[in-house]
């Protein structure tokens, strides 16, 4: 039986170190990004994202978030450039959000929280598969995008419309022909640092690429995220909210900026 973990008082982030001691490791995520303390690095390259909508596979409520999974057996949907070397394949994207619009993101910017954060998870093709890559220091690259309250975002709607079919934990349905590039902001300026998965097993294998510019989401769209359940069918319903880990100590790491 895998270690049970969640976001409640008993099984939440404060308790994860009991089963996953790396929770107190040297390169944990998320962090608070302080723009005035981030160093502009002119050697950082532009991000090259090449996503093929045909690789979209399914959408799943995993009991912690919901994720959209992609076929990753060839280089159809990839990330290159930026701070990384080589080609990383898109595996899935998922979100973290709060119970209200004043919190929910994992990364914060000078202490400012956003209501939601999108994570696009990629793995380094120098390793044979995702599982292998996830344990390597340069195995994963995750692009983080903040969602900020504003106008309704039509590009989010296809994803949100699918949530009715995966309300409870363990539910999965086909999800086809979606281009994740449509969820990215106009500017791909980013901060980058070496970190970890933000959920157990909290492996320290992630090059984080956090975009400076948020995308918009309306209050009604945020309410749709909160209609999901942590609980399985037949259990007492428990709303999926506040599924974020708070910022972790920087422990001497450098945060670099791709922009001045």
UniProtKB/Swiss-Prot annotation:
Alpha-carbonic anhydrase domain mapped to chain residues: 3-259
Region spans: Disordered: 1-31
First-level EC class: lyase
Pfam families: Carb_anhydrase (PF00194)
Co-factor(s): Zn(2+)
Location of the active site: 64, 127
Annotated residues for binding of substrate: 198-199
Keywords annotated in UniProt: Lyase, Metal-binding, Zinc
InterPro entries: CA_dom (IPR001148), CA_dom_sf (IPR036398), Carbonic_anhydrase_a-class (IPR023561), Carbonic_anhydrase_a-class_CS (IPR018338)
GO molecular function terms attached to this record: carbonate dehydratase activity; zinc ion binding
Catalytic activity: hydrogencarbonate + H(+) = CO2 + H2O
Function description: Reversible hydration of carbon dioxide.
Protein family: Belongs to the alpha-carbonic anhydrase family.
PANTHER family assigned: CARBONIC ANHYDRASE, CARBONIC ANHYDRASE 2
Stated name of the protein: Carbonic anhydrase
Originating species: Danio rerio
């Amino acid at each position: 039986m895998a270690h049970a973990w969640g976001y409640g008082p008993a099984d939440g982030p404060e308790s994860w170190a009991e089963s996953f001691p790396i929770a107190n490791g040297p390169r944990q995520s998320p962090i608070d990004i302080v723009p005035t303390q981030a160093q502009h690095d002119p050697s950082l390259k532009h991000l090259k994202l090449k996503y093929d909508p045909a690789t979209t596979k399914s959408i799943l409520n995993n009991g912690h978030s919901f994720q959209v999974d992609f076929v990753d057996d060839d280089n159809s949907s990839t990330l290159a450039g930026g701070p990384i070397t080589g080609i990383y394949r898109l595996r899935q994207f998922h979100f973290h959000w709060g119970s209200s619009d004043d919190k929910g993101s994992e990364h914060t910017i000078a202490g400012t929280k956003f209501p939601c954060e999108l994570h696009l998870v990629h793995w380094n093709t120098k390793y044979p598969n995702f599982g292998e890559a996830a344990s390597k220091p340069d195995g994963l690259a995750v692009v983080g995008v903040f969602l900020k309250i504003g106008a309704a975002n039509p590009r989010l709607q296809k994803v949100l419309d699918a949530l009715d079919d995966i309300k409870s934990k363990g539910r999965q349905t086909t999800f086809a022909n979606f281009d994740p590039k449509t969820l990215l902001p106009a500017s791909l300026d980013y901060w980058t640092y070496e970190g970890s998965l933000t959920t157990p097993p909290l492996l320290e294998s992630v090059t984080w690429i956090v975009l400076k510019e948020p995308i918009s989401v309306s209050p009604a769209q945020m309410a749709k995220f909160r209609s999901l359940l942590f609980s399985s069918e037949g259990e007492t319903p428990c709303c999926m909210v506040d599924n974020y880990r708070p910022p972790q100590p920087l422990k001497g790491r450098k945060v670099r900026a791709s922009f001045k």
